[in-house]
Amino acid sequence: MLVRGLPLRSVLVKGCQPLLSAPREGPGHPRVPTGEGAGMSSHSPRPFKEIPSPGDNGWINLYHFWREKGPKKLHYHHFQNFQKYGPIYREKLGNVESVYIVDPEDVALLFKFEGPHPERFLIPPWTAYHQYFQKPVGVLFKSSDAWKKDRLALNPEVMALESIKNFIPLLDPVSQDFVSLLHRRMEQQGSGKFSGPIIEDLFRFAFESITNVIFGERQGMLDEIVDPEAQRFIDAVYKMFHTSVPMLSLPPDLFRLFRTKTWRDHVAAWDTVFSKAEQYTEKFYQDLKQKRHFDSYPGIFYRLLASNKLPFKDIQANVTEMLAGGVDTTSMSLQWHLYEIARNLRVQEMLREEVLAARRQAQGDTSTMVQMVPLLKASIKETLRLHPIAVTLQRYPQNDLVIRDYMIPAKTLVQVSIYTMGQDPTFFSNPRRFDPTRWLDKNKDLTHFRNLGFGWGVRQCLGRRIAELEMTLFLIHILENFRVEIQHLNDVDSTFGLILIPEKPISFTFWPITRAPPQA
């Protein structure tokens, strides 16, 4: 029974016992020796069916899952299963069977054997929509050589470290405009500060950022009057995520067959995403054909066209996926980050001091400045530890694999519970504490295969560099201009809406630095 009055997250973490009973090594972030945990054993491994499990009937399991917590608490379901079964277990929900692991050493082994063309779990309703309506797909849905071809063409423009310098002039003005937006909100409230939720503004900020990086042109989403068609796209992405959850364990074709509201809303959301993305790409394609010379970086879309490595339809499909994936994910991460620094004012001041010092030393050069804020970058990792966007990472091993002395057959879905990993004292000392400095420890064993917020390896998040830079610049400008407080210090619980989102709106108070109230 849960303690009355405490949110579920608090009860779970406060009562959390280390998942592994073997003695640990190292201060703060102990690790399992490979031979003891993840390694191959000298004797025959135990069969797959002996992996701890609630039972093999997926429909009975699904019934209990829906009855007890349901999909909105999927991350807590994983957490409690690890508490019950240990560091590895298998579960079949509906027609989806997975093996779940959590120890970083086991994760390292999984990724070591992921193969040259890693495969991950495809979200069933997304796949169903694309197949039923014969929509073009990008790297999110492709596999094998088709995936590799697209990814090799995209990486130099999206993932290469040197590409960051091209993104800064496009992303930095958007962050500056967000500061201006908050000042306008203060003037409207007339109290010398702004108090209220900002998630809708963060959605628009993220959309403005990703479209500017891709197309090299602003959409005006931080103005007082915004384009209603662009707002439709933002709303559609949110609905597309939200309506996916009920169809994760039940076949989407069942929802389609009975024309449920969930399926109809999901289709309408995807239709809007594709329609608007097609309009954007066609418009900018025609504009670019008229213009051959650019005085500055023209955006990812033009660079992909100019490279001539992919046909237009593949560029269009990948741009659509980047647009759809670049709104809710980044905005939610920023909201969680503001939530944590508003609750931890000492950390906020440490971050502010680092940012102000970096600004002075860089003498106004933003490219130099973003290289001089290691604590700020560590704070982003820390936010993603406590509030990961995805609750698991998934892989289908190419060959048979032995983890914890259990044989896992090739092509079995293996899920890494990064939410549980981030909450467990076995892997992070004082896991409930927001402590960015833990990521700055020079002992690499302390962070070994723990920083998984953007995935890992060749199939990590395609938009990682954009998102990291976007969040870094945003937080730099917020910390330079405002002291951020939260109106209620009680824990805000999270809910699973395909990504982890706050269970209730978070209201912040932004004080201009010159008017910030004295610290206690």
From Swiss-Prot:
It is an enzyme of class 1 (oxidoreductase). It is a peripheral membrane protein. InterPro entries: CYP11_CYP27_families (IPR050479), Cyt_P450 (IPR001128), Cyt_P450_CS (IPR017972), Cyt_P450_E_grp-I (IPR002401), Cyt_P450_sf (IPR036396). Heme binds at residue 461. This is Cholesterol side-chain cleavage enzyme, mitochondrial. A cytochrome P450 monooxygenase that catalyzes the side-chain hydroxylation and cleavage of cholesterol to pregnenolone, the precursor of most steroid hormones. Catalyzes three sequential oxidation reactions of cholesterol, namely the hydroxylation at C22 followed with the hydroxylation at C20 to yield 20R,22R-hydroxycholesterol that is further cleaved between C20 and C22 to yield the C21-steroid pregnenolone and 4-methylpentanal. Mechanistically, uses molecular oxygen inserting one oxygen atom into a substrate and reducing the second into a water molecule. Residues 19-47 are annotated as: Disordered. The keyword Lipid metabolism applies. One of its GO terms (molecular function) is cholesterol monooxygenase (side-chain-cleaving) activity. It is found in: Mitochondrion inner membrane. Interacts with FDX1/adrenodoxin. Pathway: Lipid metabolism; C21-steroid hormone metabolism; Steroid metabolism; cholesterol metabolism. GO terms for biological process: C21-steroid hormone biosynthetic process; cellular response to peptide hormone stimulus; cholesterol metabolic process; cortisol metabolic process; glucocorticoid biosynthetic process. Residues 1-39 form a transit peptide. It comes from the Eukaryota. GO terms for cellular component: mitochondrial inner membrane. Signal peptide: none annotated. Disulfide bonds: none annotated. Its EC number is 1.14.15.6. Its cofactor is heme. It comes from Equus caballus. Belongs to the cytochrome P450 family. Its main location: mitochondrion. Keywords: Cholesterol metabolism, Heme, Iron, Lipid metabolism, Membrane, Metal-binding, Mitochondrion, Mitochondrion inner membrane, Monooxygenase, Oxidoreductase, Steroid metabolism, Steroidogenesis, Sterol metabolism, Transit peptide. The lineage of its organism: Eukaryota, Metazoa, Chordata, Craniata, Vertebrata. It catalyses: 6 reduced [adrenodoxin] + cholesterol + 3 O2 + 6 H(+) = 4-methylpentanal + pregnenolone + 6 oxidized [adrenodoxin] + 4 H2O; 2 reduced [adrenodoxin] + cholesterol + O2 + 2 H(+) = (22R)-hydroxycholesterol + 2 oxidized [adrenodoxin] + H2O; (22R)-hydroxycholesterol + 2 reduced [adrenodoxin] + O2 + 2 H(+) = (20R,22R)-20,22-dihydroxycholesterol + 2 oxidized [adrenodoxin] + H2O; (20R,22R)-20,22-dihydroxycholesterol + 2 reduced [adrenodoxin] + O2 + 2 H(+) = 4-methylpentanal + pregnenolone + 2 oxidized [adrenodoxin] + 2 H2O. The keyword Lipid metabolism applies.
